Amino acid sequence: MNTVTGAMSALITPFRNGRLDTETYEKLIQRQIRHGMDALVPVGTTGESATLSHSEHKECIEIAVKVCQGTGIKVLAGAGSNSTLEAIDLAKFAEKMGADGILCVTPYYNKPSQEGLFQHYKAVAESVGIPLMLYNVPGRTGVNLETCTIQRLFNEVKNIYGIKEASGSMERIVELNTKIPDFAILSGEDAINYPVLANHGVGVISVIGNLLPDKISALVHKALQGELDESRRINNSLYKINKALFVESNPIPIKAAMYLAGLTPTLEYRLPLVSPSQENMRMIEETLKDYEVKA
């Protein structure tokens, strides 16, 4: 199975006058390709998937696949939902469009049991022939995908190959590595990208990568090549921007930073998300002065 790993950005979704800004979206994807990312993740948490219509969600996937076609850059399409039927529909669409894999967040709000989570992921994975990456972010979903359930999925469902682990817990990373050594683990928390990579992680799905794809690409590739000191140096150099980009709920600060850096022509969110406070906006702007944001 040709899986999706390495340096990835969880793409923002730009809006203009309340609608999807497809022109800017394509430009953002092209910029990611220029700066050495291995794969892109449209319509995840950072892409405001929860407030996109189904047609907008699918359009984002279609655009990402189209722009990446022939570049060698893979697309891991967001296909999560708290409805298994909806997740299957999105997964099938992603496969039809030519996505290289799908990223599926644990069902949120309805808080299924571990057996329910197993049956959900099994149904989604078996509906398609492309790889599926699990996505665990209990702070947002209200449910934790337990290690025993992950192990069962990995053993019983052939196209489930890895996890975006966004619990922020290194203890969890070590536990997964110890109990499921052949399972692909990717950091879903920019603050611990380097520690995850240094503990047999095989990639990251980054928010910072939207703004500084060259840095995230270098951080990941140096680690995977065994140059851990250089990877750690890059990781530590991102400390200030990481603090700034999570001063409010993601993706509020990253969209503000992209706008302030001139990478998007507008700063728009879908309600209930709104712009950062004036204080936080100033802090983001000041922090950007310490970094070179390449075109």
Curated annotation (Swiss-Prot):
It is found in: Cytoplasm. InterPro entries: Aldolase_TIM, DapA, DapA-like, Schiff_base-form_aldolases_AS, Schiff_base-form_aldolases_CS. Pfam families: DHDPS. The record marks T45, Y109 as: Part of a proton relay during catalysis. Pyruvate binds at T46, I205. GO terms for molecular function: 4-hydroxy-tetrahydrodipicolinate synthase activity. Its main location: cytoplasm. The active site is at Y135, K164. Keywords: Amino-acid biosynthesis, Cytoplasm, Diaminopimelate biosynthesis, Lyase, Lysine biosynthesis, Schiff base. CDD domains: DHDPS (cd00950). The keyword Phosphoprotein does not apply. GO terms for biological process: diaminopimelate biosynthetic process; lysine biosynthetic process via diaminopimelate. Pathway: Amino-acid biosynthesis; L-lysine biosynthesis via DAP pathway; (S)-tetrahydrodipicolinate from L-aspartate: step 3/4. It catalyses: L-aspartate 4-semialdehyde + pyruvate = (2S,4S)-4-hydroxy-2,3,4,5-tetrahydrodipicolinate + H2O + H(+). One of its GO terms (cellular component) is cytosol. Its EC number is 4.3.3.7. It is an enzyme of class 4 (lyase). Catalyzes the condensation of (S)-aspartate-beta-semialdehyde [(S)-ASA] and pyruvate to 4-hydroxy-tetrahydrodipicolinate (HTPA). NCBIfam families: dapA (TIGR00674). Belongs to the DapA family. Homotetramer; dimer of dimers. This is 4-hydroxy-tetrahydrodipicolinate synthase. It comes from Wolinella succinogenes (strain ATCC 29543 / DSM 1740 / CCUG 13145 / JCM 31913 / LMG 7466 / NCTC 11488 / FDC 602W). The gene is dapA.
